[in-house]
UniProtKB/Swiss-Prot annotation:
One of its GO terms (biological process) is urea catabolic process. It catalyses: urea + 2 H2O + H(+) = hydrogencarbonate + 2 NH4(+). Keywords: Cytoplasm, Hydrolase. Gene3D superfamilies: Urease, gamma-like subunit. Heterotrimer of UreA (gamma), UreB (beta) and UreC (alpha) subunits. Three heterotrimers associate to form the active enzyme. NCBIfam families: PRK13241.1 (NF009712), urease_gam (TIGR00193). This is Urease subunit gamma. InterPro entries: Urease_gamma, Urease_gamma/gamma-beta_su, Urease_gamma_sf, Urease_subunit. GO terms for molecular function: nickel cation binding; urease activity. The keyword Ribonucleoprotein does not apply. One of its GO terms (cellular component) is cytoplasm. Belongs to the urease gamma subunit family. The gene is ureA. It is found in: Cytoplasm.
Amino acid sequence: MELTPREKDKLLIFTAALLAERRQARGLKLNYPEAVALISAAIMEGARDGKTVADLMYYGTTILSRGDVMDGVAEMIPDIQVEATFPDGTKLVTVHQPIV
């Protein structure tokens, strides 16, 4: 199977998000890469589902709270930018203060 670099990046984010979901389900607090992957994957999936950029900018702030992540992780992530594929093309989604 041949994948473009962009497709490989999406697959890596999805895999990291899946691992983060499993760890979260076991009651573990997420670290920096797990938190970023989980939020990024949710945004990419929301774009595929047809949600708008504005909807996803808000949705990205509801996925995780400070209680879901290790100490200091929320401060390490001032914003997350994701290039997501929407029905009408690729757009950049920026989520400010994703973990509150």
